[in-house]
Each structure stands twice: as C-alpha cells, then as structure tokens.
Regions:
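N-terminal accessory/interface modules of nucleic-acid-binding and processing proteins
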Residues: 2-316
Length: 316
C-alpha cells in the first residue's frame, strides 16, 4: 500500500519557510564574519583580470550584484577558486556540468529580493496596487566544484592602465569633480568636491595609480549631490572604517568590471589598521547582518554610479 504524502497547513509552511530563511541568513553572515576574522577578504587580495573577475552566472552570463559579488569572492578565496562562474544545481545540470557528490550546503548562498504585489484600499475607498519586498536565498556552486570541470582555454588580457585612467578621467569630467595632480598624498574632500592625486611620475607602479584613483572616486560617490553618504568622519572611528570599506570594495568592483587587475597593496597603507577598525565596528553592531549588507550594498551602489558614468554593464 502506498504511503500517503504528509500534508502541511499554510501556517506550518510559513513557519518552515521563515525558519529556513533565518538559517540561510545566519549561514551567509557567518561566512562573512569568519572571513573578516581570518583576513580572507576579497578587497585585500590581488585579482588578475585574466583568471578571476566579477562573479558571473554560468548560464545568463550576467554579473551578480548587490551583496553577492563580495560574498561569492569570499567563498572563492577560502576555497582557492579562480574561475568565478557560478550556477544553481539545476543550471549546472542543464549545462552538462557534473554535480555528483555535491551536497546541499556545499555551495554558497546568494541573496536577492522577491516582489509580492498586493492591493489595499485607501481612505477614499480606492484600490491601490503596492509591492512588498522580502529577502530570499539561493544556493549556487562554483564551476570548479564540478567533477568534469575544465579551465577556460582563452583568458582575457587585462585592460591597459592607460585606458583605465581614461575611464577615471571620464568619470571626473562627467561629475564635475575638481582634480589636481600634485603633492604626495591621495585624498577626497567632500566640502570642495575635490580629488587630490600625486603626479603620474610619483607612482612607481602604473596599476597603483589606477587603484588609488578609483579608491578616491569611490569616496566621491558619497557626495551629498550623488549618493549622499556620511563623509568627513574622524580617522580611526567606526564610521571612518565603514567608509574606507565602501571605497575599497567599490574600487575592486569597478576596476574588475572594467577589465583591469586589482592589487590592494598598491592602494592603502592603512589596510591593517582598517582591518582592526572593521573588526571593532562589526562587534559593536547591534544588527551585524544588516550592517554588512549595508556596507556591501553601498559599495555596489558606488561602483554602479561610477560605471554608469563610463559604460553600460550587464548585471543581475
């Protein structure tokens, strides 16, 4: 006699979905927190454009966005992957990639917003259409986890540093930011909407010039007439570390999106200090999951803002 399938009430299904979503959220955050503790952060590691770029969906060819590029790059660093193409189990199966041996939990979680349309009656008795958003998680796997994985035969050459600086200058011109090339210090002044960079000859490495330029461009996106982030925070404060975190992540996302190499050691001499501030900031956060999500989201917005001034990019 066949066993009847167990039926669940609507309330039980809702409770299970809520429990599973919270478990996924905890797992997502724990991966990021552990990376911070172990100094395994993607904006602190070098990435070569020819082998590793922005995490991309294997099937749609679109770049992941929001908090997902950072969290997937963290997973790649921990596991030692350099091919940053990902897909769901079904997508890998459809692409003839062997998922044999891969268990639930072996992949990495991406998070995205789902929309639920609904209607409400306003004070005038009229029906208004509204949309409710909620966070949902999905597990994706790196192509290198597949048994029949083969490295790509053709690797893209990184865009020359001279071309990358043209992109930077285009952003500066489009936004009306004042740029001066003098002195020995790189900085952004939100009061004057001004970027100061040492002269081209002052840089011992041309890639260092690119990285420094886009780091300061990341800060410039926070101006009140752009993305309006709190700027001008005191050195060593949690808010200072938070803004530095945004600038470092946005610089990495922008440079890799434009096809360049990323070498963080060339950007910031205060990396170790910022790491300590970041840990303290994270520990002080009452809602650490949302705090990290906000940092990653702000970095993505900063990078998107720069890229939209330069070129159109296809993302998901």
């Amino acid at each position: 006699m066949a066993m009847s399938k167990q039926k669940f009430t609507k309330a039980e299904k809702k409770a299970y979905a809520k429990k599973r979503n919270q478990e996924d959220a905890d797992r997502w955050f724990n991966q990021l927190e552990q990376a911070i503790v172990n100094n395994e952060l993607p904006w602190q590691k070098p990435w070569a454009a020819g082998t590793a770029s922005i995490p991309t969906n294997l099937v749609t060819k679109k770049r992941y966005r929001g908090t997902n590029p950072i969290s997937l790059m963290i997973g790649a660093l921990v596991e030692g992957w350099t091919d940053l193409r990902f897909g769901t189990r079904q997508q890998l199966y459809d692409a003839k990639m062997s998922t044999k041996g891969l268990m639930d939990g072996d992949g990495h979680l991406i998070r995205f917003f789902k929309q639920i349309p609904y209607e409400v009656e306003n004070d005038d008795g009229e029906i208004e259409k509204k949309v409710r958003y909620y966070v949902q998680y999905s597990e994706v796997f790196c192509v290198e986890q597949c048994q029949n994985y083969e490295p790509p035969k053709h690797k893209h050459k990184p865009v020359p540093e001279s071309e990358m600086m043209k992109f930077f200058n285009k952003f500066i011109e489009d936004q009306g930011i004042t740029l001066e090339r003098k002195g020995s210090r790189a900085f952004y002044s939100s009061k004057k909407d001004y970027i100061g960079l040492p002269s081209h000859e002052s840089f011992t490495d041309s890639l260092g010039e690119v990285m420094t330029a886009f780091h300061e461009a990341g800060h410039a996106t926070g101006h009140k007439d752009r993305l309006n982030r709190p700027l001008g925070n005191g050195f060593g404060s949690a808010d200072y570390a938070f803004e530095e975190l945004i600038a470092e992540m946005s610089s990495m996302l922008t440079v890799l999106s434009l096809g360049g190499d990323f070498v963080p050691d060339l950007v910031n001499e205060e990396g170790a200090n910022n790491q300590a501030y970041l840990k303290n900031w994270l520990q002080a956060c009452k809602d650490r999951d949302n705090a990290l999500s906000l940092a990653f989201s702000d970095a993505q917005k900063a990078s998107d803002f720069i890229l939209e001034s330069i070129e159109g990019v296809d993302e998901e």
